[in-house]
Amino acid sequence: MRVYNKSRIVGQLLFVALGITFIYYLFTPSVNSNAKVQIENRGGNSYEIYDMNKITESSDPIRNKEEVLILTPIARFYPQYWKNLLELDYPRNLISLGFIVPSSKDGAKVHRELRNAINAVQKGPGDKRFADVKILIQDSDLSSGQSEAERHKFSAQKERRGKLAATRNTLLLSTLKPSTSWVLWLDSDIVETPSTLIQDLAEHNEDVLVANCFQKQGDKLTPYDFNSWVDSQTAQELASHMDRDEILLEGYAELPTYRMLMAKIYEEHKDPSTIMALDGVGTTALLVKASVHRDGALFPTFPFYHLIESEGFAKMAKRLGHGVYGLPYYLVFHHNE
């Protein structure tokens, strides 16, 4: 009788455990960890299978354990950039980092500084480490010794931004994993963002979404990134008379386009969650669903509808049927040279 009762109790406990497990899997949303199955064959070799249908890109990325890839082309290392990156409160076990630095004398210095910063984190407590970090070194001709004024000269833009587009594509295609849900492009000179940057942008659940980038000059806020805009009839007419290899640029007196610039419509005390449709974007703080890049939306290195690099990317994403948006009252801050 005692044996019978013991067996009955064990059976009931197993039944309850199975019931709890069933309910858990029934009501728990599918997460990216379910998208990968690792199989080892008899020869000791292993391979991985990813069910891409289970990769979620949702408005609640933490709950759904969605992996984020933060990508930064880096010609100069700003400690404030790294400090701000470490203050992001998205779970680090869901964050992978990708950097690309120039293979030059200046690049070697940047590489050392970046590695030192990474090592301090990755050799620390396990719960403070990033899931994965990759540094690429490549010839890019993007000099870290140029001043901000030199980098933004009108005459230098087509060549400079074409090279930057190639650099971005190399970084993206070398680091994007099958399990990645979101790609956050974060420029190396962005030194201040809300700690909830990833969650705030993902909450809108848009295909492409960019924050508004300003500089702080004392108590004064100055708009910085003019690559996020709504197209104008004037710009379209200018483009219609251009040679196929010419590009339209924004923010230059030499080429007035009269586009609506997101940076110019910022007002204090407005709702930071306000969203607007855009035709062009910058990459200072740009969140992209990984599926958009997988669809083929990259950064054109050549004039694409007379646009190049990030603005060309926005055009390409829209041509592929994806939505492109901005947050005019949600600010991130650029290093003030």
Swiss-Prot record:
Residues 1-8 are cytoplasmic. Gene3D superfamilies: Spore Coat Polysaccharide Biosynthesis Protein SpsA, Chain A. Its main location: endoplasmic reticulum. Residues 30-337 are lumenal. Keywords: Endoplasmic reticulum, Golgi apparatus, Membrane, Signal-anchor, Transmembrane, Transmembrane helix. The chain crosses the membrane at residues 9-29. Pathway: Protein modification; protein glycosylation. Pfam families: Anp1. One of its GO terms (biological process) is protein N-linked glycosylation. InterPro entries: Mannan_Polymerase_Subunit (IPR052086), Nucleotide-diphossugar_trans (IPR029044). One of its GO terms (cellular component) is mannan polymerase II complex. GO terms for molecular function: mannosyltransferase activity. It is found in: Endoplasmic reticulum membrane; Golgi apparatus membrane. It comes from the Eukaryota. It is a single-pass type II membrane protein. Belongs to the ANP1/MMN9/VAN1 family. Required for the addition of the long alpha 1,6-mannose backbone of N-linked glycans on cell wall and periplasmic proteins. This is Mannan polymerase complex subunit mnn9. It comes from Schizosaccharomyces pombe (strain 972 / ATCC 24843). The lineage of its organism: Eukaryota, Fungi, Dikarya, Ascomycota, Taphrinomycotina.
